[in-house]
């Protein structure tokens, strides 16, 4: 029951990714704020008439999240992020309403996709999450499957990020080998904090 509640409560926003007009020279630290909503379907999703996995199977629940953090671009098409988040699971919910909070960190790559637009992908095995408040405080988790589109201003000082198409993420919690499928919507904004890649390293 507690694990099921946690699946609902955690909607980690790996929303902290973006790129610049020249992917090979985007370098610096950006501050991030964002929001995310996830639909969790423990039994998975089936295809719609166009072949997209968008139709939930069986019972579902949803969660709402806000996040803040730092994103560091290394200047070589790779980056890393560290974020905090607060998640609310509103009623009605089969496992009850809940509030949770925690931290995440991950590494990513990004590739060009149109004018000033780029596609982000998580580096496999790099995502680490920890719940430090809520019904399942102390639970660790990881996420597989992440794709976001971001657009960068010409001066590289601002980045907008969004999930632009539905896809299934899989979130796995410590103590369980069974990943939980979900589909999320997400938006975030980033602003240049410093051209250094060491800002916030002590967070």
Language-model features and meaning:
Residues 1-7:
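Bacterial N-terminal signal peptides that target proteins for export
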Residues 7-16:
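Bacterial N-terminal signal peptides
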